[in-house]
């Protein structure tokens, strides 16, 4: 049965790196991969065409597709738009719409890039970490949120950090199952000493961990985890954490490899459908110059084949 891929070029270097990746996809289809694809806009490209970063046309295509491949979103020209209309909101919206709750971010050091890392080679040689980040909850989506004026006339910004038990359970299973295919270690990262949200996170990880006796579970406060990633990163196998902490730690871990531009990522739902994109941004400063490296997007295609199409091509 033919699988359908929605391809979102996005902004900045997105169209360039996607074009090179589609060349690879076309070759695989020529060689027998039973898949087809269709393009749709997201982010700034979508705003220019439809007035919204995640328009109905794109929603319908992505909902029907078996997997989604994205270039990148974001450009300074949209920074003055109302927040709900900015390109990045399109990315948040598609994750929420498709219920893509599990973000897998590998941080692997290729031997050829050992000297590009800012850490000593002996610290990072052989590095292979997987960060499993929960994507649909936490402070990015918690309500209430906003900016209000207090009685004394001072403005106050406020957000809500929260996680439900079911949200934590499903990301815990992803983390433990990922570890079973690797070195069988999960480090749960939070701030349970001051945040009740991550106190519950820790309790549930302990509970779920009993279902995976072959996997070693440890816990670490996020500030210590950020330090340990620089001090001794090879102690980690799978790091499991919430949305905001994962956002920060995954970028930190990626730079240990010498180049953010070489790493793919996957965001999955409970059935294996996913959004696949490079870990780097839209790099508008080099857009249109044909010098953006497409490798991270090509590797994202490889993850798409593995996780959503069950094909190791």
From Swiss-Prot:
Keyword line: Amino-acid biosynthesis, Branched-chain amino acid biosynthesis, Cytoplasm, Leucine biosynthesis, Magnesium, Manganese, Metal-binding, NAD, Oxidoreductase
Subcellular localization, as worded in the UniProt entry: Cytoplasm
Domain of life: Bacteria
Single GO biological process annotation from the record: L-leucine biosynthetic process
Binding site for Mg(2+): 223, 247, 251
Cofactor(s) essential for the protein: Mg(2+); Mn(2+)
Gene Ontology molecular function: 3-isopropylmalate dehydrogenase activity; magnesium ion binding; NAD binding
Binding site for NAD(+): 281-293
Annotated metabolic or biological route of this protein: Amino-acid biosynthesis; L-leucine biosynthesis; L-leucine from 3-methyl-2-oxobutanoate: step 3/4
Residues binding substrate, per UniProt: 95, 105, 133, 223
Cofactor note: Binds 1 Mg(2+) or Mn(2+) ion per subunit.
Catalytic activity, reaction form: (2R,3S)-3-isopropylmalate + NAD(+) = 4-methyl-2-oxopentanoate + CO2 + NADH
Site keyed Important for catalysis: positions: 140, 191
Family annotation (HAMAP family): LeuB_type1
Similarity-based family: Belongs to the isocitrate and isopropylmalate dehydrogenases family. LeuB type 1 subfamily.
This protein's name: 3-isopropylmalate dehydrogenase
Organism: Neisseria lactamica
Lineage: Bacteria, Pseudomonadati, Pseudomonadota, Betaproteobacteria, Neisseriales
